């Protein structure tokens, strides 16, 4: 009876150990499967050869994939360098075109300004003789009587308006008397000896010269000193008479004697 109980306990302990250690059972089963597979491969040489071929093909595919990746990487780098060069070339072309356009725009603006000044100079040059006639009339008129003085004041009002318009346009008279002769500003129409003025000094203004915003609008016609010496015969005087007073003084209106 005791022997039967002990044998039963021994069987239960073996069953419990097998149930409590499933990992050991899995390892043992895996080892048994591997041993079976090895036995099968060793027993079947064709299967073993096929497995080896599959391993070689897998290695070749991996090597080929690696080579293709390297080739693609080198191609991408070369393409990137090419694109960078093209970008630099296009950027240089853009900068040149932008600079050319900027120069063209500046040149167009300058040409338009020059054309505008030329047209203004041409127009004002046609008006200046009218100003000269006003000044001559002012010098020659000596109004007597209330009616003549009223007419003279009306005439002076028109003259002042004309002078103001010229000033607003940037026209300014030159100051030439007692100045050194400058061919860029003056045109000498007469020369005569002078004991008071040194040589090449403007003695008299025969026709007023004008500036337009710093440019010469009209040269002044002047008489120039030859320095001390014997009296000389004057050269021909131009048709237009002299205007001895500045344009700004003329704007102030007639003097008390004229009124």
Swiss-Prot record:
Residues 46-60 have a biased composition (Basic and acidic residues). Signal peptide: none annotated. Gene3D superfamilies: 3.90.20.20, Head domain of nucleotide exchange factor GrpE (2.30.22.10). Residues 1-75, 227-259 are annotated as: Disordered. The keyword Mitochondrion does not apply. One of its GO terms (molecular function) is protein-folding chaperone binding. Pfam families: GrpE. It comes from the Bacteria. Residues 61-73 have a biased composition (Polar residues). InterPro entries: GrpE (IPR000740), GrpE_coiled_coil (IPR013805), GrpE_head (IPR009012). Residues 20-40 have a biased composition (Low complexity). The keyword Repeat does not apply. GO terms for cellular component: cytoplasm. Its main location: cytoplasm. GO terms for biological process: protein folding. It is found in: Cytoplasm. Keywords: Chaperone, Cytoplasm, Stress response. Belongs to the GrpE family. This is Protein GrpE. It comes from Prochlorococcus marinus (strain NATL1A).
């Amino acid at each position: 009876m005791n022997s039967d109980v002990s044998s039963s306990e021994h069987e239960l302990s073996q069953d419990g150990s097998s149930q409590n250690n499933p990992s050991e059972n899995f390892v043992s089963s895996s080892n048994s499967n591997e041993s079976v597979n090895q036995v099968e491969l060793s027993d079947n040489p064709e299967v073993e050869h096929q497995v080896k071929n599959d391993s070689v093909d897998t290695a070749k595919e991996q090597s080929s994939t690696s080579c293709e990746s390297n080739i693609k990487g080198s191609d991408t780098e070369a393409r990137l360098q090419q694109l960078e060069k093209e970008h630099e070339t296009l950027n240089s072309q853009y900068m040149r075109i932008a600079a050319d356009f900027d120069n063209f725009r500046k040149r167009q603006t300058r040409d338009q300004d020059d054309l505008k000044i030329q047209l203004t100079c041409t127009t004002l040059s046609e008006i200046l003789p009218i100003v000269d006639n006003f000044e001559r009339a002012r010098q020659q008129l000596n109004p007597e009587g209330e009616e003549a003085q009223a007419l003279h004041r009306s005439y002076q009002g028109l003259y002042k308006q004309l002078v103001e318009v010229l000033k607003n346009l940037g026209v300014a008279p030159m100051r030439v008397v007692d100045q050194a002769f400058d061919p860029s500003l003056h045109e000498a129409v007469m020369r005569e000896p002078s004991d008071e003025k040194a040589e090449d000094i403007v003695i008299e203004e025969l026709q007023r010269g004008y500036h337009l915003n710093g440019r010469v609008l009209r040269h002044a016609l002047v008489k120039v000193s030859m320095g001390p010496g014997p009296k000389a015969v004057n050269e021909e005087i131009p048709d237009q008479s002299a205007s001895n007073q500045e344009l700004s003084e003329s704007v102030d209106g007639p003097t008390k004697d004229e009124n």
